[in-house]
Amino acid sequence: MPNPFSKLQSHSLPGNLFASVVNDSQIIIESRTNEKKHFSTFDLKSGNLILETTSQTLTPWHSLVGIKNQYLIIQYFENKKNPDLASHFLYNQQTDEMMDELNYFSNTTQFSIPTLYLSESPDFPLFQQFIDQKIVLGCEYQEYGNKIIMSYYLQVSNEYIRRLRILVDRKIVYDEVQDDGLTGFAPGSFFTFKNRLIFVQDKKEFNIYEI
């Protein structure tokens, strides 16, 4: 049968994934290497990479939290011992400049995240039966029309492998390793937004699928 998914983009990020934000036309990824921050901007419709930059001005205490017009919204923790004290600034990705401070920030564009089921959940044995493998730690599950998207963990020696599985009309069309060598469970394996499935493999390989 033909694959009901269309891969729009697979791109190796310059660092490990740290944050992601979306609006109606773009998705922007923040990745990090040591003290450096990198921003990768993709067109949501085509999946094409529009712009990728490395900041020379932002510190580890600056984080990507939103988009406003052509600017990124950056959160800055003023007091490193008190995370409640934070301010928000507009940031120009092209010029690497902090712009105006925002008096108010609310992220109104939300992507859809899967439901989390930890191993202690009473429903977890049902997922073990459904996947037909001895899964551990937890799984993330989302239904999207006639599609089921889920990530699950398998134990190999003292480490864990996370796999991503996609079913259409209850038939498996995708089942691949998403990460290996893990030491525990980490949520946020994938999300969906406007008929797009978005996930990262091996901490750096960014993928956009049309679903």
Enumerate the language-model features and the residues they cover.
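Beta-propeller blade signature
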Residues: 40-43, 86-96, 161-170
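Eukaryote-biased, non-catalytic alpha-solenoid scaffold regions
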Residues: 47, 80, 128-134, 141, ...
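Hydrophilic extracytoplasmic domains
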Residues: 170-211
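Short beta-strand elements that form the blades of beta-propeller/WD-repeat-like
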Residues: 18-33, 40, 69-83, 97, ...
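N-terminal "mature head" segments of proteins
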Residues: 1-47, 51
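A broadly used, surface-exposed interaction patch
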Residues: 48-93
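Repeated scaffold domains used in trafficking and secretory/extracellular systems
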Residues: 8-23, 55-70, 97-143, 180-195
